[in-house]
Amino acid sequence: MAYEFNHYYELQNVATGKYVNVLGNHEDGTVKNGETVNLFSRTNNPDQRWALENFGGNGNVRIVLQRGEGWYALNYNTRNTNCIVWHLNTADDTDTVITTVEV
């Protein structure tokens, strides 16, 4: 499937059928730096909606959450193996950039 930049998608794990999800209750729209990302059953809410944002071409993208004030991107966690979300400080914030690889 081809994807469009800045269009929201739900990202599903093929093996489990579960979706990439920000853990917790965010009904008030508030997201905080460092919140854990996990796999969860489909909820049909913005905690599972992600946009692919082009970052300089060459397959470089950010995966950005729909929920929350500002831009929260999928990010790595230096303390364990779980992914987290983190607010983008600037447009040049490169620690949230990943490279897509066609398989």
Where are these regions (language model features)?
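Lectin-like carbohydrate-binding module/patch detector with strong preference for beta-trefoil
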Residues: 1-103
